[in-house]
């Protein structure tokens, strides 16, 4: 491997190792450093949803009004407990990552979930938000079992997941793309037929990699993919451009290639047992869209220009 990659490889290893050591829970986020990133999330013409009866972008419940905690609701139970339990990522730079300098999990997703906690408790105290670091594979079972109240984990709203979980309205529009080393001759996923392409085990990307006749290499964390790419063990990484942008920021010897492969609309995952909580969360997200907080968070964590704010569409 080229020696110039080693410092960046070391950073990826540190982030992965420290993330694994953190385990189940972490403290609330502290302000981080903004990234220098050039957009890339504007709306584009990409693959349409596979099922005509399902529209992931218009599958959530309409808010009943401003976010309010009324007696007997799930939000009231959370308030009585004293804290919201959120399943989050700890290895996706910009969105949910463990900052090795302060030991805090921080990022765009964390800002979204912190706003939900603030709306429930009426203040932004970190004591009211418990962050539980989970892998991609843990997202669905942890929501369904009640291990967490909500998941903010770069989680794509899909027709399959909607069978088991409810989601908020779309809070971020991403698109699946491909990341390779800068010396790669590949220009799209189609050029990687017969070659190894990394993705996390529970991501939607794995099936699309296989469909392109590439060889999926599933791992637990996205930083594991970056290490494999740097070591030459895989030819590429394919997932949401939001995640790939974070990996590219950690290694300047990588580049994104090809057109968008599929839409990846992100939503906050919630149990189907708590529709009132879905409506509450959607009311919070609507406030973030209109009061400037969404744009401020994007600017802080992801950079400029700020992408168009995803507009809410509801099923009922």
For each predicted feature, which ranges?
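Extracytoplasmic small-molecule ligand-binding "clamshell" domains
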Residues: 47-50, 56-151
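C-terminal region of N-terminal signal peptides and the immediate post-cleavage residues
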Residues: 22-47, 58-60
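Extended ligand-binding regions for polar small-molecule ligands
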Residues: 41-69, 203, 268-306
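Acidic, polar ligand-binding/catalytic clefts
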Residues: 118, 125-191
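Bilobed "Venus flytrap"/periplasmic-binding protein-like clamshell domains
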Residues: 94, 105-120, 155-158, 174-226, ...
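N-terminal export and membrane-targeting signals
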Residues: 1-18
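Periplasmic-binding protein-like
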Residues: 42-44, 172-180, 241, 245-284, ...
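Alpha-to-beta junction loops
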Residues: 84, 144-153, 231-240, 253
């Amino acid at each position: 491997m080229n020696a110039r990659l080693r410092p960046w490889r070391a950073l990826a290893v540190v982030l992965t190792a420290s993330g694994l050591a953190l385990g189940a829970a972490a403290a609330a986020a502290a302000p981080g450093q903004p990234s220098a990133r050039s957009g890339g999330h504007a709306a584009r013409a990409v693959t349409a949803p596979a099922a005509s009866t399902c529209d992931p972008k218009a599958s959530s419940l309409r808010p009943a009004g401003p976010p309010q905690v009324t007696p007997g609701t799930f939000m009231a139970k959370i308030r009585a407990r004293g804290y919201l339990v959120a399943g989050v990522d700890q290895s996706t730079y910009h969105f949910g990552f463990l900052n090795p300098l302060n030991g805090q999990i921080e990022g765009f997703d964390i800002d979204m979930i912190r706003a939900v906690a603030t709306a429930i408790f009426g203040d932004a105290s970190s004591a009211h938000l418990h962050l539980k670091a989970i892998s991609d594979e843990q997202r669905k079972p942890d929501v369904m079992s009640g291990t967490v109240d909500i998941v903010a984990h770069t989680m794509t709203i899909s027709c399959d997941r909607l069978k088991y979980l409810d989601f908020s309205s779309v809070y971020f529009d991403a698109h699946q793309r491909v990341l390779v080393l800068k010396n790669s001759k590949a220009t799209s996923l189609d050029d990687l037929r017969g070659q190894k392409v990394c993705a996390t085990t529970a991501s939607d990307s794995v099936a699309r990699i296989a469909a392109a006749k590439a060889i999926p290499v599933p791992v637990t964390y996205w930083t594991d993919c970056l290490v494999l790419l740097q070591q030459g063990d895989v030819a590429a990484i394919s997932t949401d451009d939001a995640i790939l942008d974070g990996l590219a920021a950690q290694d300047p010897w990588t580049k994104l290639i090809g057109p968008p492969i599929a839409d990846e609309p992100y939503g906050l995952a919630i149990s189907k047992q708590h529709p009132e909580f879905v409506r509450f969360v959607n009311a919070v997200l609507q406030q973030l869209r209109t009061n400037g907080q969404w744009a401020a968070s994007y600017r802080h964590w992801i950079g400029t220009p700020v992408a168009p704010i995803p507009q809410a569409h509801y099923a009922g």
